[in-house]
C-alpha cells in the first residue's frame, strides 16, 4: 500500500513550506506508477480516491481500474466557495482544516488514543474493529508514547487546499470505476 506524502510511513516527505496543493499527491502517485512494470488497480478514500482519479487520467496505461471510497468531488458552487476562501487567505478557517489543526497529536498509548476516539465525532458510528485498526495504524511510537503519523498541521493544510476540480480528470478516465459513498451524512 502507498502512503500519501505526510501520511503514515511517508511523514518525512512532508514539508509545509513547499506545500501548494494536491498536485504534489498526484505527481507522487504517478511517480510510483511509473516504477511499476505492470498496470494496477488503484483504491483510495477521500483525497486518496481523488488522487487515484487524477493519476488514472494522466497515466491511463498504468491503471487497470479504480475503487473509490468517497472521493472529494464537489459541485461547482462548493468549489467556487472554497476557491474564494483560499483567495481571501481564510482556508485555515474551514471547519475540516480548523478541526484537524486542533487534533491531539500525542497519547500515552494506543489504548489511550482508542479511548479518546471511541464514540466521538466522525468515529461514533465506527465498529470497534475499525476504530482499533485505525488507531493501530494512524499512530506511531514516539518514545514511551504514540503520536499521529500524519501531523495535525499537515492534515489541516491538506484540508485547507481542498479547492481542486477533478472533473477534467474524471472526463478523461478510460478504465472501470467502482465508486462508494456514504448512505447518509458524509464529510461535507
Task: Please identify what each model-predicted range represents.
Residues 38-82:
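Conserved hydrolase catalytic core segment
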Amino acid at each position: 500500500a502507498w502512503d500519501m506524502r505526510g501520511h503514515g510511513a511517508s511523514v518525512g516527505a512532508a514539508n509545509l513550506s513547499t506545500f501548494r496543493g494536491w498536485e504534489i499527491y498526484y505527481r507522487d502517485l504517478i511517480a510510483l506508477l511509473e516504477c511499476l512494470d505492470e498496470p494496477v488497480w488503484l483504491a483510495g478514500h477521500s483525497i486518496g480516491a481523488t488522487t487515484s482519479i487524477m493519476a488514472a487520467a494522466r497515466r491511463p496505461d498504468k491503471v487497470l481500474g479504480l475503487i473509490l471510497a468517497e472521493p472529494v468531488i464537489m459541485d461547482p458552487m462548493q468549489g467556487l466557495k472554497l476557491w474564494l476562501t483560499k483567495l481571501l487567505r481564510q482556508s485555515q478557517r474551514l471547519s475540516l482544516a480548523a478541526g484537524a489543526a486542533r487534533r491531539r497529536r500525542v497519547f500515552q498509548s494506543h489504548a489511550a488514543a482508542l479511548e479518546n476516539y471511541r464514540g466521538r465525532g466522525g468515529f461514533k458510528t465506527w465498529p470497534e474493529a475499525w476504530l482499533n485498526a485505525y488507531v493501530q495504524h494512524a499512530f506511531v511510537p514516539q518514545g514511551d508514547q504514540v503520536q499521529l503519523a500524519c501531523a495535525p498541521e499537515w492534515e489541516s493544510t491538506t484540508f485547507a487546499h481542498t479547492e481542486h476540480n477533478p472533473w477534467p480528470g474524471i472526463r478523461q478516465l478510460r478504465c472501470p470505476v467502482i465508486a462508494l459513498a456514504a448512505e447518509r451524512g458524509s464529510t461535507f
